[in-house]
Design a protein with these regions (language model features):
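Loop/turn elements at helix/coil->beta-strand transitions in domains of secreted/extracellular proteins
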Residues: 43-46, 76-82, 136-142, 198-203, ...
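Bacterial Sec-dependent N-terminal signal peptides
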Residues: 1, 15-43, 373
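Terminal, contiguous helix-loop blocks that mediate binding/assembly
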Residues: 32-33, 158-161, 167-397
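Acidic/histidine-rich, surface-exposed loop or edge segments in extracytoplasmic proteins
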Residues: 43-55, 105-114
């Protein structure tokens, strides 16, 4: 309303000025109408699903592909493009597009790739993103990572294919699980960060286990406006794409409603599920509070903290609960400052009553984000100390 009144006054004064000067000079010619920018992409949004299905998730990929097509049925493919990069164990690697055919929605191949480069190689990720943006340019972009995930922990892979008789089945580290050439290969999150262009995606959605960790989120903070991820495991069925795609395939993606659909899908079945939506533009206020919490860092007891991992992963604890325990020994730390920052940063979060181990999740201590217990020495600590999050909040300790 204030803007309207301001412009109304401006127009009135301009009219009075022109009337007063009309006897001196002729009125200026009207400004020509702006012409459309021929460089403006015709599509409103292109969403890329980067799917590594060359592993035990292949049957889930087929199911999710059908869901994605169902989600695109009411969407104009001339204005909104859904692209899926997928790799199978057979070595069949291609970029597909959801298109309208005489038989209904289906995927058609728009580019094929060689299978000598693993899909967990950051060079392939960069190549596919560049292809997607060149082949289907749009005014905005979204990105789904579809595969296995395990937070920040590295594999240290050189992404070199090995003969089948040399394949070693490692733990699921970071992102991927490409078994195209016999070795189960993974992409570390610093590699992922180097492969992703800055300030390109409206959102990144990790449809993988454990990727809602502060280490992953902070490493990718400059890659998108928003992020959706799960601090715990997620069932291999993943997101209900028939509901999610229509909500995110529009100029203003409704990520909160899409996350709610995902949570409700599992919660109604009384299955474990956690999810969070983050506004990445608000993350530095969180890191400021955490830097203060760690200014007088000492190891803390973690046995009674809420834990989101199981088996040999992590352990990954609730981020806020861990930070407050560490910060209790720092005179610079203010819990209220952290709570305010988190309220702006995590714009939606939800958790089921129990986790995947059958233990209750305390909603009062559920932040939607996990964290590593800093300086609990493991074989991966050297790598952990190289991550942006550690450097940001530990003051070089």
């Amino acid at each position: 309303m204030k803007k309207f009144i301001f412009y109304t006054i401006q127009l009135f004064l301009a009219a009075c000025f022109m009337a007063a000067c009309s006897g001196d000079e002729p009125s200026p010619a009207p400004e020509p109408e702006p012409t459309p920018n021929p460089e403006q992409p015709g599509r409103k949004r292109t969403i890329l699903v980067y799917a590594i299905a060359s592993n035990n998730l292949v049957s889930d990929f087929y199911d999710d592909s059908e869901e994605m097509l169902d989600g695109m049925k009411q969407i104009d493919p001339e204005e909104y493009s859904l692209l899926v990069y997928r790799v199978f164990r057979s070595g069949d690697v291609a970029l597909l597009e959801a298109t309208s055919t005489d038989a209904g929605m289906d995927f058609t191949i728009i580019k094929e790739y060689d299978n000598q480069t693993l899909s967990t190689d950051p060079r392939r990720l960069t190549e596919v993103i560049e292809d997607a943006m060149e082949l289907r340019p749009a005014q905005s972009y979204g990105l789904f990572f579809w595969a296995h995930g395990s937070s920040w922990e590295p594999e240290y892979s050189e992404h070199t294919p090995l003969p089948l008789n040399q394949a070693q089945p490692p733990m699921l580290y970071a992102y991927g699980g490409d078994q195209t050439t016999g070795v189960s290969d993974w992409m570390d999150i610093d590699e992922m960060a180097s492969a992703l262009p800055d300030n390109t995606f409206d959102f990144i959605w990790f449809d993988n286990c454990f990727m809602s960790s502060i280490e992953v989120i902070y490493q990718l903070r400059n890659k998108a406006n928003f992020m959706v991820a799960y601090p715990t495991e997620i069932y291999s069925y993943g997101a209900p794409y028939e509901s999610v795609i229509p909500l995110v395939m529009k100029p203003d993606a409704d990520l909160i409603e899409a996350a709610k659909e995902t949570f409700n899908f599992y919660n109604f079945q009384r299955l474990a599920c956690t999810v969070a939506v983050m506004d990445l533009s608000k993350i530095e206020a969180v890191s400021d509070a955490c830097e203060k919490a760690n200014s007088n860092f000492t190891l803390v007891k973690t046995l009674d903290l809420q834990k989101y991992s199981r088996f040999s992963y992590g352990p990954y604890f609730d981020f806020v609960q861990l930070t407050k325990r560490i910060g209790a020994k720092s005179p610079d730390f203010d819990e209220t400052e952290l709570d305010r920052a988190m309220a702006d940063f995590v714009i939606y979060k939800a958790c089921s009553a129990k986790n995947f181990s059958g233990k209750e999740i305390d909603p009062e201590n559920y932040s939607g984000i996990s964290a590593h217990a800093y300086k609990v020495y493991t074989t991966h600590d050297e790598y952990y100390r190289s991550l942006d999050w550690y450097k940001r909040i530990m003051n070089g300790q």
